[in-house]
Amino acid sequence: MSGQGPQRRLLGSPNATSPTTPHFKLAANQTGPRCLEVSIPNGLFLSLGLVSVVENVLVVAAIAKNRNLHSPMYYFIGCLAVSDLLVSVTNVLETAVMLLVEAGALAAQAAVVQQLDDIIDVLICGSMVSSLCFLGAIAVDRYLSIFYALRYHSIVTLPRAWRAISAIWVASVLSSTLFIAYYNHTAVLLCLVSFFVAMLVLMAVLYVHMLARARQHARGIARLRKRQHSVHQGFGLKGAATLTILLGIFFLCWGPFFLHLSLMVLCPQHPICGCVFQNFNLFLTLIICNSIIDPFIYAFRSQELRKTLQEVVLCSW
């Protein structure tokens, strides 16, 4: 894709150079504004991708190993790990192939490179869509477990969870294929941006509602213990901080990428928007960082999963 769209690293992009250290660069055209461009070294990009791969492989292995983790909640977490794993693997693969082509170690015709790039882009886009979907699915699952605790196991059954998981993967593959095929069409870009906004709003509404319920529960306990003010205030600050971190990381890691897509629709030729387009590889790096952070937010907080993870790591040595 061009510099105004999601860049195809194999075919060249404004950031497709090979710096050895990250740096900030001010670039200016004769008729345009001075732009702050953040160059991401290929070594750093590959290293972050490999860290994400290792983390998410361990999460998937731990869930597969421990039968106590074979429940809808952990299946959603496992699928999120698979999605993040695919995000990292496909980006690392694309960067590695790009470096081989640039170094002359991989000789291929332009048509072959184009086809390979299309396949990798479909995988990247599909894994991103599925990752967002499973973040939303985890939020819905947690919401149901709190507000429908007595009926939760009859509502969220394994067959229903597997149907939801299958639907998410199918929808992700189809939507990513359409996106890569018609990425220049405004309607496709608007659909992707709208999808991100919908996921952000869904997660914000559900988690804020869950926080309100938890604070209400804490007030009830505080009344019984006659320490209402201190307990309620402490819990409120802790809950608000957790919610801010969860939604803040989601927005900071995914927001720039979808801002990029929004500007492709709103101002594809504007010089200031062009400054944003030049940092597309930085936005991809933020998504890789999100894949690294997700296991700490959703998986590693589980004591059962951490225990199984230790067993997996010890068995591998």
Swiss-Prot record:
Glycans are attached at residue 29. It is a multi-pass membrane protein. The keyword Metal-binding does not apply. InterPro entries: GPCR_Rhodpsn, GPCR_Rhodpsn_7TM, Melcrt_ACTH_rcpt, MSH_rcpt. GO terms for cellular component: plasma membrane. Residues 1-37, 94-118, 184-191, 267-279 are extracellular. SUPFAM superfamilies: Family A G protein-coupled receptor-like. Receptor for MSH (alpha, beta and gamma) and ACTH. The activity of this receptor is mediated by G proteins which activate adenylate cyclase. Mediates melanogenesis, the production of eumelanin (black/brown) and phaeomelanin (red/yellow), via regulation of cAMP signaling in melanocytes. This is Melanocyte-stimulating hormone receptor. It comes from Vulpes vulpes. The gene is MC1R.
